[in-house]
Amino acid sequence: VDSQFVTREKDRLLAELFEFLSIPSISTLPDHAADCRRAADWLMNQLTVLGCPRVELLEGNGHPVVWGESPEVAGAPTILIYGHYDVQPVDPIDEWVSPPFTPTIRDGKLYARGAIDDKGQVFTLLKAYEAVRDADGRPPVNVRFLFEGEEECGGDVVFDLLAAQPERLRADAVLVADMGYYAEGWPAVYTALRGMCYAELHVRTSERDLHSGHYGGVAPNAIETICRMLTDLKGRDGTINVPNLYESVIPPSDTERAGWESLPFDREKFLREELTAKSMTGIESASVFERTWALPTFEFHGIRGGFTGEGAKTVIPASAVAKISLRLVPGLSLEFVKQQLQLAVENVAPDYAQWELRFLHGGDPVLIDVDHPAFAVLDRAFEEVVGRRTVAVRAGGSIPIASVLGTGGAPVLLTGIGLPDDGLHSPNEKVTVQQMWDGIRVFGTFFEMFGGRD
């Protein structure tokens, strides 16, 4: 890698990244559909400037997919790069120190929505290719770029595209930089991702809201009902009361558990800096790694119903809605969990309540075999640039398309430059600027090594 690339181009790189991060490409909010298209157009322009002879905007029933192919180098291996240009909503907006779409650097950290998830990492991959593109007169690898705009909202455009055109997955390796270091100074490669089952639970207990004075004491309350149903579905100890769930889980191997036990872990720092909480919850007999990586979880994301405006209104709400999700681990398919969750809700719903589960999006968990030689190359690239090889860990999060990316037969390398306190999905999301510069060098070095230039 050109060792002076970042030093020489730093101002330009930051200006370009600020442009990208300034686009509020929130995929789940319809009002931002035009912004998602602007972000896609920005990426298309980047690929064109990089010299890609084939750049396409692939349309579907949702936000478009950006596709690009680098100039073909005969005999060189092909890497498929995946990332996403959409971002999470910014609520609660009043907790941001600086506006989420006004990128701001403070103390060597760049704050903006999408700084690490995933615009900053997409940018790092693009610039890594730029850094090695002209070395020795030609790029060391062929690169296919696949950037979607619905990773955060669970859309189907990229799934439909790859189902119809599976040849786009043909590559010698798939590189996904949407993850992070295990800890500062500890780069990681990921052996598993949890899947997702996201749904809304709708409950109705009467035809209309009722006067709490006239009917309090006899009328069923929809908010109370939905809360009781939810706490019946998830016990105080964190146990999920969904039939056949735990029995279907594929447990981690003894080797994997031993690897986790060797990792540095500061419980108090984890509580203070990552959870920002006084204590942990969950199944106490399971380790923190097991709870966050190897066991399913059930979370409640929001409840609406009744009166939540300023002042007082004394009603007994007739309806309520809860947004819920389960994170799935190997052994639990999305379709299986949908069926079991339906049965579980039937078991806890009172006779007086009408209810409906509406499934919004999801994906299967992913288990990855890291024995492929490509992982050893990535390991060497990290060691050369940051001085430490990767550790093998799992991720608690989900990348819906990950279960599809490897179906073409290529190994899927899940890695990234994030740090645990980067605040993904939270106010004041950030990326450490030096991590980004290191990432450009790491991925550029990986391209060169994978292409045989080491």
Predicted segments with their positions:
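Active-site metal-coordination/substrate-binding segment of hydrolases
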Residues: 76-147, 438
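N-terminal helical capping/dimerization or prosegment-like subdomains
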Residues: 1-93, 319, 323, 336
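A short core secondary-structure module
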Residues: 216-238
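An extended, acidic, His-containing surface patch that forms the Zn2+-binding/catalytic region
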Residues: 74, 183, 241-319, 331-340, ...
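A common structural junction motif
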Residues: 86, 233-237, 342-352
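Histidine/acidic-residue-rich, glycine-tolerant segments that coordinate divalent metal ions
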Residues: 140-221
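A generic structural motif
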Residues: 116, 207-209, 325-334, 363
